[in-house]
Amino acid sequence: MNTTKTKKQTTAMARVVLLGLLMLLPMTVGAQRVLTLDSCRAMALRNNKQIGVAKTKQEINANLRKSARTKYLPQVNALGGYTWTSKEISILNDEQKSILGNLGVDVGGALQNSLAPLVSLLPAPAQAKVAQDLTHLTGLIDQTGQKMKNAFRTDTRNMFAGGVVVTQPVYMGGAITAANKIADINEDIAQNSFDAQRQNTLYHIDQAYWQVVSLRYKQKLAESFLDLMKKLNSDVQRLIEEGVATKGDGLSISVKENDAEIALTKVSDGLALARMLLCQLCGLPIDETITLADEVSEDIAVQEITVQPDVQQAVANRPELKLLQNTVDLTQQTTKELKALNLPQVMLTGGYAVTNPNTFNGFEKKFGGFWNLGVLVRVPVWNWNDTKYKVRASQGATTIANLELADAREKIELQVNQSSFRVNEANKKLAMAKANIAHAEENLRTANIGFREGFVSTTTVMEAHTTWLSAQSQLIDAEIDVKLSQVELQKALGTLE
């Protein structure tokens, strides 16, 4: 019964311990950040400042393209203004104003002179009646003249004007079409710049990632070699005590051990710097502790590929070539835009205008308006060949852009062939490094056996260890070189994604 009770207690305790371990497991995993190549790439793309700039340029050029499209549409503008002048516009001169102002006096005097002989024949009461009528008529004519004088007054010292104007381009010599194509090309340039920056970011993050992996494996190798040297030094010291080995052998081993410690320090420092660079590219704090998935595996996973140079694929995919082609297209459209300056331009205009004072019913001190519709034609006549010279300069820029495009194609063709050659060369080096590893390990095993048996010298054992270390280091370099050569080929072909 006690035995059964003890078993139950033991089982319960085991469950508690297991539960505690399971609870601690997430904390342990969370403390150690393991990054894969894909996760490093994703973080680098998210945090790269230049990619952010490229994205913003895409948005800018998309808005500029939309702006260019509006040039096909009618433009509506509202205008308004006020003007004060110290003098008003006068339709009549001073003499004419004086004549109208004294019109009654002049006419009355003329009538009185003309009718005087006849009036003198009338009786006195009749003469008085005629004189009274002439005076009244003179006053009426004076009033009429004054009204005519005032009617011709413009009163333009305070002028108001306003209106709404609509303009619709009909033919602009192809300038609007060229401007829209330029906007489309600029949008393509922004996209191709983004693709180029993205590929450069991936290329650099891959290099930094595999550099860390390479140095980590070399650090493990240096630690292993240092352990071997320490063990060998211990064995030699024991043999010296037994009188089998000399002090010179012991000193040689000590020097090798010190060299191994120095090598380990160098590779550890290099690894720390490489991790800092990788963290910076990923947007992480440079002092953050990270572990890469490929550095904790037994071996570096290498997949060899056989490639044939495909220049056409590179020409179709490389964003650098697309950017140069964009430059060619841009200069061609700029030439068309300049040529449009020498062609006639036709626009429809229309709108509604108001003025105060207005002249639609004489001069009235109030707002009056009217509708209008018209055609505006602009025909260049002579500009001293200014446009002609600009067109020639733009055509020269097109020639330069075509030459740069052809030169870039030749260089990319060479780059693709070099990258393909490097991939094949890296595969061969990897095969030779693997073969050297087998020979070096067998040589080391034989040397160790001979040393233990006493018929192999310390120098021979150290040479075997050094050869083994060199072979292991060459294998790491060969494996990493295969990885980097494949990345370089993808970048050369424009397929790095």
What residue ranges belong to the model's regions?
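Small/polar (Gly/Ser/Thr/Ala-rich) solvent-exposed segments
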Residues: 52, 76-90, 147-157, 167-196, ...
